[in-house]
Amino acid sequence: MDNSLKTSVMIIEDDRDFRELLEGIFERSELFDLVGSFNSVEAYGAEMLKNKPYVSWLPQLLVVDVMSSKDPRQESASFISALRSEGLRFATLFVSSMDFGALLRVLRKSHPHGWSSLQKTSRLTEQDIVEAAVSAFNELRSI
């Protein structure tokens, strides 16, 4: 399939095993084009600063572990929300071992569309991940 027809995706995940699992899922998918993978929001931010204009570098979808910062006092949701507040437009799929429905409700107050979330559990399937990614992207695209 022509990559120009696929949704571009980047991953920010500090757990190497889970990051590799996500990379495999998005590489195998006919719907997505994996264009980057990072082990922390700091690594993502550093790479982003090297790639101006940001709007042409950003993917259409970011898959982000909520706690993927190297600083335990930080979390990635604030970083992602700040990027959106600057007018950057991309869908976001949050993944975490925590249940964070309340966090999504807060994020939706300032940026209502393009969010999805998944809780990391032993029952999480490849289909669950792809469906949540598609849902986040379609929600943002529909506005």
Report the location of each language-model feature:
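Short, aromatic/basic amphipathic alpha-helical patches
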Residues: 22-26, 79, 104-110
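Conserved acidic carboxylate
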Residues: 13
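Short alpha-helical segment
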Residues: 41-50
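Two-component/phosphorelay signaling modules centered on CheY-like receiver
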Residues: 7, 16-42
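A short, hydrophobic beta-strand element within the central beta-sheet of small alpha/beta folds
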Residues: 62, 81, 88-107, 118-119
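The C-terminal output helix
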Residues: 127, 131-143
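Conserved phosphotransfer microenvironments
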Residues: 41, 57-86, 99
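Short, glycine/charged-rich "phosphate-handling" switch motifs in NTP-dependent
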Residues: 115
